[in-house]
Design a protein with these regions (language model features):
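N-terminal Rossmann-like NAD(P)+-binding domain of SDR-like oxidoreductases, especially those catalyzing
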Residues: 1-175
Protein backbone atom coordinates (compact mmCIF):
# COMPACT_ATOMS: atom_id res chain seq x y z
CA UNK A 1 0.00 0.00 0.00
CA UNK A 2 1.38 3.41 -0.97
CA UNK A 3 1.81 5.99 1.79
CA UNK A 4 1.12 9.67 1.25
CA UNK A 5 2.01 12.57 3.54
CA UNK A 6 0.05 15.81 3.16
CA UNK A 7 0.91 19.15 4.72
CA UNK A 8 -2.09 21.47 4.94
CA UNK A 9 -4.42 18.49 5.29
CA UNK A 10 -6.90 20.60 7.30
CA UNK A 11 -7.33 22.96 4.35
CA UNK A 12 -9.77 22.60 1.48
CA UNK A 13 -7.30 21.10 -1.00
CA UNK A 14 -5.68 18.86 1.60
CA UNK A 15 -8.98 17.38 2.75
CA UNK A 16 -10.13 16.72 -0.83
CA UNK A 17 -6.76 15.19 -1.70
CA UNK A 18 -6.94 12.90 1.33
CA UNK A 19 -10.38 11.74 0.21
CA UNK A 20 -9.09 11.00 -3.31
CA UNK A 21 -5.98 9.15 -2.12
CA UNK A 22 -7.99 7.05 0.34
CA UNK A 23 -10.35 6.05 -2.49
CA UNK A 24 -7.28 4.86 -4.42
CA UNK A 25 -6.16 2.66 -1.53
CA UNK A 26 -3.43 4.88 -0.05
CA UNK A 27 -2.44 5.04 3.59
CA UNK A 28 -2.81 8.77 4.25
CA UNK A 29 -0.92 10.80 6.85
CA UNK A 30 -1.21 14.53 7.46
CA UNK A 31 0.89 17.12 9.23
CA UNK A 32 -1.16 19.50 11.36
CA UNK A 33 -0.15 22.45 13.52
CA UNK A 34 -1.51 22.39 17.06
CA UNK A 35 -3.31 25.72 16.70
CA UNK A 36 -4.68 24.66 13.30
CA UNK A 37 -6.35 21.67 14.93
CA UNK A 38 -7.78 23.89 17.67
CA UNK A 39 -9.14 26.35 15.10
CA UNK A 40 -10.49 23.88 12.56
CA UNK A 41 -11.20 20.85 14.75
CA UNK A 42 -10.51 18.83 11.59
CA UNK A 43 -13.89 20.08 10.28
CA UNK A 44 -13.13 19.35 6.65
CA UNK A 45 -11.84 15.85 7.37
CA UNK A 46 -14.92 15.13 9.46
CA UNK A 47 -17.21 16.59 6.78
CA UNK A 48 -15.81 14.42 4.00
CA UNK A 49 -15.75 11.35 6.25
CA UNK A 50 -12.00 10.81 6.28
CA UNK A 51 -11.04 11.92 9.80
CA UNK A 52 -11.01 8.37 11.16
CA UNK A 53 -9.05 7.08 8.15
CA UNK A 54 -6.23 9.66 8.17
CA UNK A 55 -3.35 9.56 10.64
CA UNK A 56 -2.36 13.06 11.71
CA UNK A 57 0.98 14.10 13.15
CA UNK A 58 1.86 17.38 14.83
CA UNK A 59 4.43 19.46 12.99
CA UNK A 60 5.10 22.84 11.47
CA UNK A 61 6.74 23.88 8.21
CA UNK A 62 8.98 26.24 10.18
CA UNK A 63 10.12 23.52 12.60
CA UNK A 64 12.60 21.28 10.76
CA UNK A 65 12.97 18.74 13.61
CA UNK A 66 9.20 18.15 13.71
CA UNK A 67 9.13 17.59 9.95
CA UNK A 68 12.09 15.22 10.12
CA UNK A 69 10.42 13.26 12.92
CA UNK A 70 7.17 12.86 10.99
CA UNK A 71 8.81 11.94 7.69
CA UNK A 72 11.12 9.44 9.43
CA UNK A 73 8.12 7.86 11.12
CA UNK A 74 5.89 7.70 8.03
CA UNK A 75 8.50 7.12 5.29
CA UNK A 76 6.04 8.25 2.60
CA UNK A 77 6.08 7.26 -1.06
CA UNK A 78 4.57 10.63 -1.94
CA UNK A 79 4.70 14.03 -0.23
CA UNK A 80 2.12 16.70 -1.03
CA UNK A 81 3.17 20.09 0.33
CA UNK A 82 -0.08 22.06 0.44
CA UNK A 83 0.60 23.85 3.72
CA UNK A 84 0.93 27.61 3.33
CA UNK A 85 -0.13 31.03 4.52
CA UNK A 86 -2.61 31.44 1.69
CA UNK A 87 -4.37 34.76 2.33
CA UNK A 88 -3.23 37.21 -0.34
CA UNK A 89 -4.61 40.32 1.40
CA UNK A 90 -3.15 39.34 4.77
CA UNK A 91 0.24 38.75 3.14
CA UNK A 92 0.57 42.54 2.84
CA UNK A 93 0.08 42.87 6.61
CA UNK A 94 2.38 39.93 7.42
CA UNK A 95 4.99 39.74 4.65
CA UNK A 96 7.76 38.21 6.78
CA UNK A 97 5.49 35.48 8.11
CA UNK A 98 4.23 34.78 4.59
CA UNK A 99 7.75 34.46 3.14
CA UNK A 100 8.96 32.35 6.07
CA UNK A 101 6.04 29.94 5.85
CA UNK A 102 5.70 29.70 2.08
CA UNK A 103 9.36 29.84 1.04
CA UNK A 104 11.46 28.71 4.00
CA UNK A 105 8.78 26.15 4.84
CA UNK A 106 9.21 24.69 1.35
CA UNK A 107 12.97 24.63 1.88
CA UNK A 108 12.52 22.72 5.15
CA UNK A 109 10.24 20.17 3.46
CA UNK A 110 12.67 19.75 0.56
CA UNK A 111 15.61 19.19 2.90
CA UNK A 112 13.68 16.60 4.90
CA UNK A 113 12.62 14.92 1.64
CA UNK A 114 16.16 14.98 0.22
CA UNK A 115 17.83 13.61 3.34
CA UNK A 116 15.25 11.10 4.61
CA UNK A 117 13.22 9.74 1.70
CA UNK A 118 14.80 10.90 -1.60
CA UNK A 119 13.07 8.15 -3.59
CA UNK A 120 9.62 9.52 -2.78
CA UNK A 121 7.72 11.84 -5.10
CA UNK A 122 7.24 15.47 -4.02
CA UNK A 123 4.42 17.79 -5.07
CA UNK A 124 4.48 21.52 -4.31
CA UNK A 125 1.22 23.47 -4.57
CA UNK A 126 1.44 26.63 -6.65
CA UNK A 127 -0.88 29.54 -7.32
CA UNK A 128 -2.00 31.81 -10.14
CA UNK A 129 -0.77 34.61 -7.86
CA UNK A 130 2.74 33.73 -9.08
CA UNK A 131 1.83 35.38 -12.39
CA UNK A 132 0.25 38.48 -10.88
CA UNK A 133 -1.34 40.59 -13.59
CA UNK A 134 0.70 39.02 -16.40
CA UNK A 135 -1.25 37.62 -19.31
CA UNK A 136 -0.32 36.46 -22.79
CA UNK A 137 -1.33 38.46 -25.88
CA UNK A 138 -4.75 36.79 -25.90
CA UNK A 139 -5.43 37.74 -22.26
CA UNK A 140 -4.82 34.24 -20.86
CA UNK A 141 -2.32 33.01 -18.27
CA UNK A 142 -0.36 29.91 -19.25
CA UNK A 143 2.66 28.08 -17.88
CA UNK A 144 4.69 30.08 -20.42
CA UNK A 145 3.35 33.39 -19.08
CA UNK A 146 6.16 35.27 -17.30
CA UNK A 147 5.94 35.23 -13.52
CA UNK A 148 5.27 38.70 -12.18
CA UNK A 149 3.86 38.45 -8.64
CA UNK A 150 2.22 41.54 -7.18
CA UNK A 151 1.86 40.45 -3.54
CA UNK A 152 4.08 39.00 -0.82
CA UNK A 153 2.03 35.80 -1.17
CA UNK A 154 2.73 35.61 -4.92
CA UNK A 155 6.44 36.29 -4.33
CA UNK A 156 6.59 33.54 -1.70
CA UNK A 157 5.00 31.03 -4.07
CA UNK A 158 7.53 31.91 -6.80
CA UNK A 159 10.33 31.35 -4.27
CA UNK A 160 8.88 27.95 -3.37
CA UNK A 161 8.53 27.05 -7.05
CA UNK A 162 12.14 27.98 -7.75
CA UNK A 163 13.39 26.01 -4.73
CA UNK A 164 11.58 22.89 -5.96
CA UNK A 165 13.00 23.39 -9.45
CA UNK A 166 16.50 23.78 -8.02
CA UNK A 167 16.21 20.66 -5.83
CA UNK A 168 14.84 18.63 -8.74
CA UNK A 169 17.84 19.49 -10.91
CA UNK A 170 20.60 19.69 -8.30
CA UNK A 171 19.69 16.52 -6.42
CA UNK A 172 17.87 14.57 -9.16
CA UNK A 173 14.71 14.34 -7.06
CA UNK A 174 11.24 13.49 -8.34
CA UNK A 175 9.80 16.88 -7.44
Amino acid sequence: MKKALITGINGQDGSYLSELLLSKGYEVHGIVRRHSVAENQDKRLVKNGTSDKVTTHYGDLMDYPSLARVVSTVMPDEIYNLGAMSHVRISFDMPSFTIQTNALGVLNMLEVYRTICPNAKFYQASSSEMFGNSVDEDGVQRLTTPMNPVSPYGCSKVMGYNLVRHYRHAYKLHA
